[in-house]
């Protein structure tokens, strides 16, 4: 606009201009006008082109600025997200560092415990080896005691059978003595002179025939008494020796007492073994329980002797009255 105003002012007629030649000045003025118009047109074109270029450049710059702003905003967001990620990673690293320190401390403690467990394992291995040796020794002892127990059981059975036989023989002899005494009482003497003598003989026979040894030199009178009456049915078939029977019974009692003592000692040994093997393997406990069951099932019975002979004999010749109480 300023250029147009200047051009209009320049194109206005100047009243102060005095031309030397009117024709030349008019033509020159026209050419000058044309040139000035053309110049202004070119200038306006140039200005408009430059204005358009400037506007384009301005728009481009604005787009670039907007793009830069968008890019900077995006970059800012990315930076913020990266900063947050870095913060999270730092926290994770700190947590991992703490966890690694805790793990290292735990590892050190576990190494110490492992060393202590190795020492304890060696001690327990040595102890288990000693226990195995002791178990083998105890097993041998148990086998020995088992064999002894079986032998003692067999001895108990044999002694029980012999005791039964002895009781039967004693009862048989007692019944025989009673029968013979009754038969002797039923026999009548032939004359009065032999009556007293027969009574004495019968009394002596009832007292001494199953008990005295008629073959001994001290009992010669009794030998003559037995030979007086050959028709007498009383003949001693078996010599009864009370002292020998009593000694035999006492020996049996001692034997049974020894067997009971052995049985009690064996029970005590089994109790000791059970106390020792409380913390041992189940196999040994099963064997020990089997031994205890064998002891319970095969315990020797308690034998009691009740052989009593309380018959009092009448004194004959030099024989003193004897009270045989075999208890």
UniProtKB/Swiss-Prot annotation:
GO biological process, alphabetically ordered: dynein-driven meiotic oscillatory nuclear movement; homologous chromosome pairing at meiosis; horsetail-astral microtubule organization
GO CC, alphabetical: cytoplasm; meiotic spindle pole body; nucleus
Listed GO MF terms: identical protein binding
Biased composition annotated in UniProt, kind: Polar residues: 217-232
Biased composition range(s): Basic and acidic residues: 175-199
SUPFAM superfamilies, per the entry: Tropomyosin
Keywords associated with the record: Coiled coil, Cytoplasm, Cytoskeleton, Meiosis, Nucleus
Location(s) in or outside the cell: Nucleus; Cytoplasm, Cytoskeleton, Microtubule organizing center, Spindle pole body
Coiled coil: 66-188, 243-297
Span list, region Disordered: 175-234
Top-rank taxon: Eukaryota
Extent of Low complexity compositional bias: 202-212
Subunit-level organization: Interacts with alp4, kms1 and mbo1.
Function: Has a role in meiotic nuclear oscillation and recombination. Required to remodel astral microtubules into the 'horsetail' astral array maintaining the 'horsetail' nuclear movement. Promotes homologous paring of chromosomes during this movement.
Identification of the protein by name: Meiotic coiled-coil protein 6
């Amino acid at each position: 606009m300023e250029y147009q105003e200047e051009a209009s002012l320049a194109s206005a007629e100047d009243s102060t201009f005095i031309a030397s030649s009117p024709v030349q000045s008019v033509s020159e003025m026209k050419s000058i006008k044309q040139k000035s118009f053309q110049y202004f047109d070119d200038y306006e074109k140039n200005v408009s082109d430059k204005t358009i270029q400037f506007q384009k450049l301005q728009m481009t710059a604005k787009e670039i600025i907007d793009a830069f702003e968008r890019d900077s905003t995006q970059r800012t967001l990315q930076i913020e997200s990266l900063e947050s990620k870095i913060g999270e990673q730092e926290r994770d690293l700190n947590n991992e560092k703490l966890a690694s320190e805790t793990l290292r401390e735990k590892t050190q403690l576990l190494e110490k415990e492992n060393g202590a467990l190795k020492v304890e394992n060696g001690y327990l291995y040595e102890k288990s080896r000693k226990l195995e040796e002791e178990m083998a020794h105890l097993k041998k002892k148990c086998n020995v005691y088992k064999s002894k127990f079986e032998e003692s059981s067999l001895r108990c059975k044999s002694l029980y059978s012999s005791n039964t036989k002895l009781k039967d023989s004693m009862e048989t002899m007692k019944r025989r003595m009673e029968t013979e005494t009754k038969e002797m009482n039923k026999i009548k003497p032939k004359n009065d002179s032999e009556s007293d003598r027969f009574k004495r003989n019968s009394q002596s026979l009832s007292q001494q025939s199953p008990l005295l040894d008629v073959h001994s030199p001290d009992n010669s009178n009794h030998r003559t008494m037995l030979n007086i009456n050959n028709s007498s049915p009383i003949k001693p078939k078996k010599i009864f020796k009370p002292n020998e029977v009593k000694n035999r019974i006492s020996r049996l009692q001692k034997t049974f007492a020894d067997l009971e003592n052995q049985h009690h000692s064996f029970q005590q040994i089994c109790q000791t073994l059970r106390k020792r093997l409380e913390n041992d393997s189940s196999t040994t406990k099963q064997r020990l329980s089997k031994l205890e069951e064998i002891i319970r099932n095969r315990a020797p019975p308690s034998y009691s002797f009740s052989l009593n002979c309380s018959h009092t004999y009448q004194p004959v010749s030099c024989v003193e009255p004897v009270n045989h109480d075999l208890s």
